[in-house]
């Protein structure tokens, strides 16, 4: 059984989707990030970075519990555990990992910053600085959308012919 500690955010949703698609048994536990629950001692023992999502696999690789934090690491772990969505063939595996890291290192952070500057920054830094952030991160988000559109024009899924963890990310 896998315990999923998460909240209704893009990073949390990608792991929830992956768990559903793999069919691995799991229990979901809400971590209310608005109330700061991600900073509790309990949660930080699972996710030292104090960010959701995190999982605890009660039946880890050696039969003992293992905790995994960071959405990309969780997707890889779950794919390997389930034997699905991460190809074994080296070129296909590299492609899936490239697109996974493209998402967790680029798309997620850029979209998060665009959202922050669009919705929250004006009150903290003023309209002029907030507008700069909105322009910068929206431009980068649009560039990333174009990269994804181009890739999906070449293949049915981000990493090629088959669905992979890159598509869940």
Language model: regions and residue ranges:
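GST-like domain detector, emphasizing the conserved glutathione-binding G-site
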Residues: 1-135, 149
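Amphipathic alpha-helical segments that form well-ordered structural scaffolds
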Residues: 18, 140-143, 147
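Generic secretory/membrane-interface signal
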Residues: 35, 92, 143-144, 161
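Hydrophobic alpha-helical bundle segments that form small-molecule/ligand-binding pockets
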Residues: 145-159
């Amino acid at each position: 059984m896998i315990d999923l500690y998460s909240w209704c955010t893009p990073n949390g949703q990608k792991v929830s989707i992956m768990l559903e698609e793999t069919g691995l048994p799991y229990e979901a536990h809400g971590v209310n990030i608005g109330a700061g629950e991600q900073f509790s001692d309990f949660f930080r023992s699972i996710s030292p970075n104090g960010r959701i999502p995190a999982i605890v696999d009660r039946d880890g690789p050696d039969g003992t519990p293992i905790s995994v934090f960071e959405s990309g690491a969780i997707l890889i772990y779950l794919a390997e555990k389930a034997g699905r969505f991460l190809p074994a063939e080296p070129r296909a595996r590299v492609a899936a990992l490239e697109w996974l890291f493209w998402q967790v290192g680029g798309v997620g952070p850029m979209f998060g910053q665009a959202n922050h500057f669009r919705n929250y920054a004006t009150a903290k830094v003023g309209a002029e600085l907030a507008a700069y952030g909105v322009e910068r991160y929206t431009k980068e988000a649009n560039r990333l959308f174009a990269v994804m559109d181009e890739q999906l024009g070449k293949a049915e899924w981000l990493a090629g012919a088959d669905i992979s963890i890159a598509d869940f990310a």
